[in-house]
Design a protein with these regions (language model features):
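Early extracytoplasmic/domain-onset interaction patches
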Residues: 22-61, 142-143
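Post-HExxH zinc-binding segment in Zn-dependent metallohydrolases
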Residues: 282-291, 316-317, 328-381, 585
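Sec/Tat signal peptide C-region and signal peptidase I cleavage site
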Residues: 17-21
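Non-catalytic architectural context of zinc metalloproteases
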Residues: 34, 46-48, 63, 68-77, ...
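Juxtacatalytic substrate-recognition/specificity segment
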Residues: 210-336, 342
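Bacterial N-terminal signal peptides that target proteins for export
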Residues: 1-7
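C-terminal recognition in membrane/secretory proteostasis and scaffolding
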Residues: 347, 357-625
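Bacterial N-terminal signal peptides
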Residues: 7-16
Length: 625
C-alpha cells in the first residue's frame, strides 16, 4: 500500500473517531413521581460515556431564577453503575454542582440513579422551593437530572418518561409521544427534546386538575392543580378574563413565539409561592383559594399576566448575557430592568386590559407601587442598576431592613420607569405612537416557535429611537444610576395623575393587608409589621426608626393597651392633630421598652388623583384594545 493511501486511511479513521466523539449524546431519563406525596422523586438516567473521567453537571443557573440557586442540596441517593458494577464518584471540590465519575475501560454507557427531596415544609424559592403535597406536585426537570460536560444545552437530546401517582392527571407543554399505565398509574413518554426544551417544560400533576381552554390558534390553556376540588370552582368570569388576557397580549405584541402555551397554576397553601417563566408555559403558585376567593384573586391578579409576557420578553427576547450555553456558566443580570422591569409594566397593563382588575383597582395598585418605591431610603446609597447587578444575592435577602438594603426593586421601580417611557412616547408622537409600537417592533412579527433572539442595552435604545427619537440613552442612564430623592413619578404625573395620601385605605390596600396578613404603617410612622405584631421593617428617617425601633422587634402594646391591628389603627387616628406622643411597648430579644413617637399625622394610605391640567393618558394606557 502506498504511503499516501495509508495516510488517507489514517486520516479517514481519525476523522471518523473525532466525528463520533463530537456527536452530542442522547440521554434517557425516567422519573418516578409516585412518591410525590412523600416529597421525594426518583430518577434513572442512561448517559453515553467513554473510559476515564466522566464529568456531570447538576443544573446551577436556572433560567428565570437569575441566581446560582439550583437545588443541589436536595440531591440524594446518587449512584452510578456500568456493566453491572457500581462506579466510584466524587464531587468537585471547587464546584459542588459538578460530579466526577470514574468510567472503566470498555464501557460506553453509565447508569445514574438519584432522588430529589422536595422541601417537606413551606420553604425555599423557585424550583428549590416546596413543590409537592398529598394531592399535587410540580416536576421541574432541572431538579431530577444530570448532564455531561462538553456540549451546549441545545445540543443534547433527552428522551424522557414520567410515572405519576394513581389517578393523577397532568399538564405540560412538553410534546407527548405516548401514555400507558396500570392500576390507575399513568406513565408518559415524551417526544425527544433538547435539554433546553426539557428544562423549560415543567409538568404539573395532581388528583384535582382542571384544564381550561383559552384560545385555539395557537392552542392556549390553563392547567390548574389544587389541593381540593373546591379550589377549582372559580366563577365563570375568571376564565373570561384569562381569555381576554391571551387576546390582549397577542394584540400588544402582534405575534407569538410558542407552538402552544400552558398556564401551569398551583393552588396550595403548602407549596412555595412564586411565578417562574418558561417559553411555552409558566409555573405559578398561589394560595389554595387563590382563584375562588375574590380578595386573594385580586392580590395576585398580575401574576399570570407577568409570566405570560415573559414568553415574549425574557424568553424570545433575552439579554445576551442571560443567554448562556448551559446551566453552569454564570449569568449577568445587569439588564433585568428590561427583562423583569418591562415585563412587570406590561403585566400591569394587561391585567387592566383583560379585566382581571378594573381600572380603579389597577390605578390603586399603581399608587401602592409608587408609594412603596417613594419610601425606599436605601436608594440614597444603592442605585437601581445595583439592585439588578446584585440580584443573585438580593433575591434571597431577608425582609428585615428591606427599605434600607433595597431588594429586587427593578420590578416595581421599573414599572414606574416604563410607564414614564410610554408617556414620553405618547407625548413626543402627539398620541400617534405608544409602548405597543415598541412591543411590535422588538418582540413582534413574524410569529415563530420557541426561538431565542438576544439584545443589548444599545439594542433597546435603538429600538426606542425607531419609535420616537429621544435621548433614551440619557433617560435610562439617569434612571438607573441616580440616587433620588424619591421614586420616579414622571410617568404618573405625565399621564395626568398625582400621588397623594389620605386616611382611607383603598380596596387594593385593604385586600393586600388581609391576604398577606400584614399591617401597613409605612406611610405614617414608617413601620411594617405582621398581624401578630412582629416588626418586619422600619423606614430610616421616619418616626418609628427615629425613636429607636428596628426590624426583629415585636409590638406588644399601643398607648398602654395590648396590641392588635385595630388598636394601632385607632391610636393613629386618635392622635391626629393632637399633642400626646404615640407610645409603643416593644419586645426586643426578651427585653421590653416603651418608645414615644412624636407623630400626629394620622393614618396615611396612597391614592392617585387626577391632575386636570394634563390629558388622562393612564386611562388610555389601561383601556382594552
Amino acid at each position: 500500500m502506498k504511503l499516501s493511501r495509508i495516510l488517507g486511511v489514517v486520516c479517514l479513521l481519525f476523522s471518523s473517531l473525532c466525528s463520533r466523539a463530537a456527536t452530542p449524546p442522547t440521554v434517557t431519563i425516567f422519573v418516578d413521581a409516585t412518591s410525590a406525596p412523600r416529597k421525594i422523586f426518583h430518577a434513572k438516567l442512561k448517559i453515553p460515556a467513554s473510559a476515564g473521567d466522566l464529568t456531570l453537571y447538576y443544573p446551577k443557573w436556572i433560567p428565570g431564577e437569575h441566581a446560582p440557586d439550583g437545588p443541589v442540596v436536595d440531591l440524594a441517593g446518587l449512584k452510578f453503575s456500568a456493566g453491572g458494577k457500581t462506579l466510584k464518584w466524587r464531587r468537585d471540590l471547587l464546584d459542588g454542582f459538578t460530579i466526577h465519575v470514574d468510567v472503566p475501560a470498555g464501557e460506553n454507557e453509565v447508569n445514574a440513579e438519584l432522588d430529589f427531596l422536595s422541601p417537606a415544609t413551606f420553604e425555599g424559592g423557585f424550583s428549590a422551593g416546596s413543590s409537592a403535597t398529598d394531592k399535587m406536585a410540580v416536576i421541574s426537570w432541572n431538579q431530577v437530572l444530570l448532564y455531561p460536560k462538553g456540549w451546549k444545552a441545545d445540543d443534547f437530546t433527552y428522551v424522557a418518561s414520567l410515572k405519576l401517582p394513581a389517578n393523577w392527571k397532568y399538564g405540560t407543554p412538553l410534546p407527548i409521544a405516548s401514555t400507558s399505565g396500570e392500576s390507575g398509574e399513568t406513565q408518559i413518554t415524551f417526544k425527544p427534546a433538547s435539554l433546553t426544551t426539557l428544562v423549560d417544560s415543567p409538568v404539573i400533576t395532581g388528583e384535582y386538575l382542571k384544564v381550561v381552554k383559552l384560545a385555539d390558534d395557537p392552542p392556549t390553556e390553563m392547567d390548574i392543580a389544587a389541593d381540593s376540588a373546591a379550589a377549582l370552582a372559580a366563577p365563570p368570569e375568571v376564565w373570561d378574563h384569562y381569555k381576554n388576557l391571551v387576546e390582549q397580549a397577542n394584540k400588544l405584541f402582534g405575534a407569538h413565539h410558542y407552538r402552544d402555551y400552558h398556564f401551569l397554576l398551583s393552588l396550595s397553601d403548602h407549596v412555595a409561592h412564586f411565578g417562574l417563566e418558561h417559553h411555552e408555559s409558566d409555573d405559578s403558585r398561589v394560595d389554595e383559594r387563590g382563584l375562588v376567593d375574590e380578595t386573594a384573586r385580586k392580590a395576585e391578579a398580575s401574576l399570570l399576566p407577568h409570566e405570560y409576557v415573559h414568553s415574549w420578553n425574557g424568553k424570545y427576547r433575552r439579554p445576551a448575557d442571560l443567554a448562556t450555553p448551559d446551566y453552569q456558566q454564570p449569568m449577568q443580570d445587569d439588564l433585568l430592568w428590561v427583562y423583569e422591569g418591562l415585563t412587570n409594566y406590561l403585566g400591569t397593563v394587561l391585567t387592566a386590559r383583560s379585566g382581571l382588575l378594573t381600572f380603579e383597582q389597577s390605578r390603586d395598585d399603581l399608587a401602592i407601587t409608587a408609594a412603596m418605591m417613594d419610601h425606599i431610603p436605601g436608594r440614597t446609597w444603592r442605585s437601581l442598576q445595583d439592585t439588578a447587578d446584585a440580584a443573585p444575592q438580593l433575591y434571597f435577602a431577608p425582609q428585615a431592613w428591606y427599605s434600607w438594603r433595597r431588594g429586587v426593586d427593578f420590578y416595581d421601580e421599573d414599572t414606574l420607569n416604563w410607564l414614564w417611557v410610554d408617556v414620553i412616547i405618547r407625548q413626543q408622537s402627539k398620541g400617534q405612537k405608544t409602548i405597543d409600537d415598541f412591543c411590535h417592533l422588538f418582540h413582534g412579527p413574524p410569529s415563530t416557535g420557541p426561538i431565542l433572539k438576544t439584545y443589548t442595552f444599545d439594542d433597546v435604545v435603538n429600538a426606542l429611537n425607531q419609535i420616537v427619537p429621544y435621548d433614551w440613552r440619557g433617560f435610562w442612564t439617569e434612571r438607573l444610576t441616580n440616587h433620588g430623592p424619591g421614586a420616579p413619578l414622571g410617568g404618573i404625573e405625565g399621564s395626568g395623575w398625582k400621588l397623594v395620601y389620605d386616611d382611607n385605605p383603598s380596596e387594593m390596600e385593604r385586600g393586600a393587608a388581609g391576604n398577606f396578613h400584614v399591617v401597613d404603617g409605612a406611610y405614617s410612622i414608617g413601620l411594617e409589621l405582621r398581624e401578630d405584631g412582629s416588626i418586619t421593617d422600619t423606614i430610616e428617617g421616619m418616626p418609628a426608626a427615629v425613636a429607636g425601633i428596628g426590624p426583629g422587634m415585636k409590638l406588644i402594646a399601643v398607648n398602654g393597651r395590648q396590641y392588635s391591628p385595630e388598636v394601632l389603627h385607632d391610636a393613629l387616628k386618635a392622635g391626629k392633630d393632637g399633642n400626646t406622643p404615640l407610645e409603643l411597648l416593644v419586645e426586643n430579644t426578651d427585653y421590653y421598652k416603651t418608645y414615644k413617637l412624636d407623630y400626629h399625622g394620622g393614618e396615611r394610605y396612597p391614592h392617585l388623583v387626577r391632575d386636570e391640567s394634563k390629558p388622562d393618558l393612564l386611562t388610555e394606557i389601561y383601556k382594552a384594545k
